[in-house]
UniProtKB/Swiss-Prot annotation:
Native species: Mycolicibacterium vanbaalenii (strain DSM 7251 / JCM 13017 / BCRC 16820 / KCTC 9966 / NRRL B-24157 / PYR-1) (Mycobacterium vanbaalenii)
A Pfam family per the record: ribosomal_L24
Functional note: One of two assembly initiator proteins, it binds directly to the 5'-end of the 23S rRNA, where it nucleates assembly of the 50S subunit. One of the proteins that surrounds the polypeptide exit tunnel on the outside of the subunit.
SUPFAM superfamilies in alphabetical order: Translation proteins SH3-like domain (SSF50104)
Molecular function terms from GO: rRNA binding; structural constituent of ribosome
Designated gene of the protein: rplX
Annotated S-S bridges: none
Example of a GO cellular component annotation carried by this entry: ribosome
Protein name: Large ribosomal subunit protein uL24
Family stated for the protein in its record: Belongs to the universal ribosomal protein uL24 family.
Subunit structure: Part of the 50S ribosomal subunit.
């Protein structure tokens, strides 16, 4: 999966199309990401249980995971881009690059 925790992404389809946010959690096995302020749902929780963003029970509004195919990574210029890889000569590790401008992400 080319999107990781901490990346800034743009939602390209769905009810929150056009929204920008930071990736809070990435779920590579499910191909989903949790984006800050996107795909908000209302969840009914019991009094004894604590969920994300709630100290006690009741109706809690929180983010739900969104498919990684519905988001696009933003490059250093703030424009949506596809992601590619190149091998770093010094370390020998793969580095993500923005296809739009060729810069490292």
């Amino acid at each position: 999966m080319k999107v990781r925790k901490g990346d800034t992404v743009l939602v390209i389809s769905g009810k929150d199309k056009g929204a920008k946010g930071k990736v809070l959690v990435a779920y590579p096995d499910r191909n989903k990401v949790l984006v800050e302020g996107v795909n908000r749902i209302k969840k009914h929780t019991p009094e004894s249980r604590t969920e994300r963003g709630a100290s006690s029970g009741g109706i809690v509004t929180q983010e739900a995971p969104i498919s990684v195919s519905n988001v696009m990574l933003l490059d250093s210029d703030g424009k949506p881009t596809r992601v590619g890889y190149r091998r770093d000569d010094e370390t020998g590790k793969n580095v993500r690059i923005a296809k739009s401008n060729g810069k490292d992400i």
